[in-house]
Amino acid sequence: MDEEKYPAWLADKVLNTSFDWKTVTKTSMSELLAVITLHDSYWYNTYVEDGNAWVLVINLDAVWNKTFCHNLEDWPFLVLRFQQVFCSFQDFNDYDNDHRIIGDAESAPLNSGRLFEWLQFGQASGLLSSDATKKVVETKSVCRTEISTVYGGLLSLIHAPVIEILLYSEQGSQLSINLVAP
């Protein structure tokens, strides 16, 4: 990985999927977005772990998020893990290849009527297995998170409400997470 883009410690954690998930803060994406903005942050990486957990690595804009970022000059790395992703869609263009600069992010629960329609469509079209449908029903509450880039790219995830977050300084030290709005 390019040292200019990825500090060595981050490249190691991404390539070896070795983030310390024992020290996470659990929250919902809606609660996180009530405290921070992802606007102008750099979206470094996305990968999928066993069990269809999605991990996003974001270089969080410290200018927009002074309090959350411990008033650091250097932008810290926010690592998000969505444990149960039931469906995903992504569409990016050539401008998004190097760094994906985030324009906006939003997350909201799917109402039960929309969820039921989505499940029916997923089963009828063969996009959702009966196992996946069963997991969604067992979860009882499902959220849709959309992250868009300034160049028109988009990631959309249908997932269980609880996400896990980690925050690291640019040098790789783990930072505490404060979910109290400034």
Predicted regions and their residues:
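Surface-exposed, interaction-prone regions used to assemble/regulate multi-protein complexes
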Residues: M1-P182
